């Protein structure tokens, strides 16, 4: 049976393009469309969809306002945001949307040529396939993330080991990170390097928001900076992140612009993990994080 998708966008052209893309996959069917969040709210009150593709900026009720209303009223939805890369405000709103229940997002094309191109088609179908594969249909929208009132106590490690945590996230990663990073203790006895597969512009917004929510420091990684304990370094979108041993035996961040995307990903987690073999760390914990609904 095909998965029923609701498309919400104020542009008639974008609605048609996204519906055509969705219908081109035999697993999906663009069952309904709406011009704004208010129309979508009325539909979602009475109809369950397997997925919702939701624009950010719309008249009457925008995407974030719709998510807040769904959350408040406990209306079920699996939401993928569509957000403009060139608008820094939309990047911030998209990160907030993850707290309001959105599972992931895709970058909105800037013109009709891009909208009808293969890259956007692959991106939209790829995210829908991944999201619906890891989600129960019509998962309840979750409460907003709140900082931990008290971080769990950390036991002091013995032996003076030099440790590193390396995190990788893909589909649903931003949502999953909001359930993990805010609960890391400020005194974590290791730096954390993190690759989230996101386009440029969004990683800075995500780092800033996670820093606001967390006791541990969170920042977008910078080329050449030395890794410090108790800090999370997020790879910037559009750049590969590597860890390199310095001449004095410490470790620093290397941001790689030159290497092409690997499997369509830049940053690519595999490249980060490969670089760790040349670092000076005694213990490295590697984690791949994916958001899934509870059983």
Where are the regions a protein language model picked out?
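Conserved acid/base catalytic micro-environments in cytosolic active-site loops
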Residues: 2-6, 12-23, 33, 38-39, ...
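Residue immediately C-terminal to the conserved phosphorylatable aspartate in receiver
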Residues: 44, 51, 56-57, 70
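Acidic, metal-coordinating helix/loop segments flanking the phosphotransfer/catalytic sites
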Residues: 33-51
């Amino acid at each position: 049976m095909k998965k029923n998708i609701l498309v919400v966008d104020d542009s008639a052209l974008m609605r048609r393009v996204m519906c055509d893309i969705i219908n081109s996959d035999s697993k999906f069917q663009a069952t309904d469309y709406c011009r704004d969040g208010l129309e979508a709210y009325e539909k979602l009150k009475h109809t369950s969809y397997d997925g919702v593709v939701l624009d950010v900026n719309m008249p009457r009720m925008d995407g974030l306002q719709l998510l807040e209303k769904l959350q408040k009223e406990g209306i079920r939805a699996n939401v993928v945001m569509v957000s403009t890369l060139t608008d820094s405000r939309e990047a911030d709103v998209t990160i907030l949307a993850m707290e309001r229940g959105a599972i992931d997002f895709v970058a909105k094309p800037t013109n009709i040529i891009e909208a009808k191109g293969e890259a956007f088609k692959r991106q939209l179908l790829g995210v829908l396939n991944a999201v619906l594969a890891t989600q129960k249909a019509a998962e309840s929208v979750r409460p907003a993330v709140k900082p931990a009132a008290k971080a769990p106590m950390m036991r002091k490690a013995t032996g003076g080991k030099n440790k590193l945590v390396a995190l990788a996230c893909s589909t649903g990663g931003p949502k999953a990170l909001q359930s993990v990073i805010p609960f890391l203790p400020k005194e974590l006895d290791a730096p954390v390097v993190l690759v989230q597969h996101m386009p440029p512009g969004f990683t800075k917004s995500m780092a800033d928001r996670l820093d606001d929510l967390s006791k541990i420091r969170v920042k977008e990684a910078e080329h050449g900076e030395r890794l410090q304990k108790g800090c999370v370094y997020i790879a910037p979108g559009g750049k590969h992140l590597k860890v390199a041993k310095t001449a004095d035996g410490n470790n620093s961040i290397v941001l790689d612009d030159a290497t092409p995307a690997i499997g369509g990903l830049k940053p690519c987690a595999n490249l980060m993990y490969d670089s760790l073999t040349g670092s000076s760390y005694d213990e490295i914990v590697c984690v791949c994080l994916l958001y899934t609904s509870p059983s």
